[in-house]
Swiss-Prot record:
This is C-8 sterol isomerase. One of its GO terms (molecular function) is isomerase activity. GO terms for biological process: ergosterol biosynthetic process. The lineage of its organism: Eukaryota, Fungi, Dikarya, Ascomycota, Pezizomycotina. It comes from Neurospora crassa (strain ATCC 24698 / 74-OR23-1A / CBS 708.71 / DSM 1257 / FGSC 987). It is found in: Endoplasmic reticulum membrane. Belongs to the ERG2 family. Residues 7-30 have a biased composition (Low complexity). The chain crosses the membrane at residues 40-60. Its EC number is 5.-.-.-.
Amino acid sequence: MPPKKQSSSGGNKPSGSGSSSGRSSSGSSCRCSCRCRCSIGGWLKFFAILFALVAPIAYVLEQRLESFYVFDTEHLHDLSKRAISAHGNDTKAIVKYIVDELNDRNGVAPYVNNDEEWVFNNAGGAMGAMYIIHASITEYLIIFGTAIGTEGHTGRHTADDYFHILTGTQTAYVPGEYEPEVYPPGSVHHLVRGTVKQYRMPESCFALEYARGWIPPMLFFGYADTLSSTLDFPTLWRTSVITGREMISNLLKGKF
């Protein structure tokens, strides 16, 4: 008796199963791709709406920026020169002279921090210490310097920065130049908003640093070295507490 032929349907099962699996995998891939596109589209829509809401507010505030300032650049320059004239190379006495006069100045005194809280500051590869005299949304005034010298990147900021050199000398460099900019005591190094330089304090140097513009975005520059290099979180915490305290305190006083 001849053997029974095997049914061809049995041989086709693996092929059908593979085809079904391929279609299933293809369908899953399409659904995943669709979800990704929807997710990206959702985020793009969110940022577009956020930008549409924030941009007009930022524009209006930018036009009114000058009205938020309580410090005057010419007065700070004059004050720095008078302090230097009165105390020479005595940095501590110079700082006291400056803070005392600010405390006697109408419109400024309520916003001055009289607690001389010095903290290390690492930013742009440079290291020094600072005493925050004032911090708000649109201005900050600090004493910054070091007794042993430092060098680094100025950062590219959303505010104009004025370095009033009190003691020592600061030098700066701009690409394309062959000679350094030199700032001795009594001079002002003005870093224009949005520009950048290399700077150096070869030896002991202290400055009254005044920034006017949008201050919060500058904080990222101040935090970057700690987060990526020094990992000095106690100093970062103390700096954040002092800065936040002063900003909030000034906001409560109506100083933006």
